[in-house]
Amino acid sequence: MWSKAAPAVLVLLGSCRAQPSEPHFPSAHRDVAPIVGGVFSTEDARDRMGEAEQVMQLAGVKPGMSVADVGAGEGYYTVRLARVVGAKGRVLAEDIVPEVRDSLSERVQRENLDNVAVKLGAADNPMLPAQSFDRVFLVHMYHEVQSPYAFLWHLREGLKPDGLVAVVDSDRPVQRHGIPARQLKCEFAALGMDPVKFSMLTGGDAYYMAFRLARPRPAPDTIQACGA
C-alpha cells in the first residue's frame, strides 16, 4: 500500500526524467531591428492612406474567415479585420508584450468585439492553434523578429492547408525598420513557403507579399539560413 509520501516520490521521479531538448534553429545572419513599440503610425494617418483596405483586399479577407493578427500592437488591424470577417468569423490578436496584450484586451472589450480573442505569444513562437487560420497577418513587425527561422517554423503550423501568410513591411534595410522583399522571400522559402502575390502599397515604401505552404515543414537542423 502506498504511504502518504508516495505522491511526492512520484513527482520527484517524474522530474528526474530527461526533458526533450529544444530544437536548434539557425540564426538570422542579418540585422534584426529593435522593437520600438506597438504603434507603427497613427490610425488616422493609416486610414488616410487606405492601408488596411488595400491589404485586406489583396489578402482576400472575407466574412466568416478565421484570421490571426500576429504582433497586433494596439490593434489597428485587429479591429478592422474583425469588422470584415463579421460575426461568423474569428480574429486572434497576438502580441509578445504583456502590457500591450492587456491594453489590446481592454480595447476589444470596450469596442464590443465579440469575435476577437487576445493572447500572449513568445518572441520565437506565436503559439497559434494548429491548422486554424485562413490568413495570418504580419504587419510592420517581421523585421523585429529575433529568430525568424524558429518563428516561421512554428507559425506555419497555424495555417489551414490553403491558408496564406500576409506580410506588410517596408522595402528598406532592416536597420531602418524594414526588410528587402528579396530577403523576406528567401527566409520564407527556407521554411517551405512560396510567394503567391506581391504588390507595392500606395502612399509610401511599404509592400504586401503573401505566402502559401508549398513544401513540408523542414526539420530545424536542416534549415538553410539565407546568407549563411
At which residue positions do the language-model features occur?
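Conserved class I S-adenosyl-L-methionine
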Residues: 164-187
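A short glycine-rich, Lys/Arg-flanked "PGG" loop and its adjoining helix->strand segment in the class I
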Residues: 82-83, 149-164
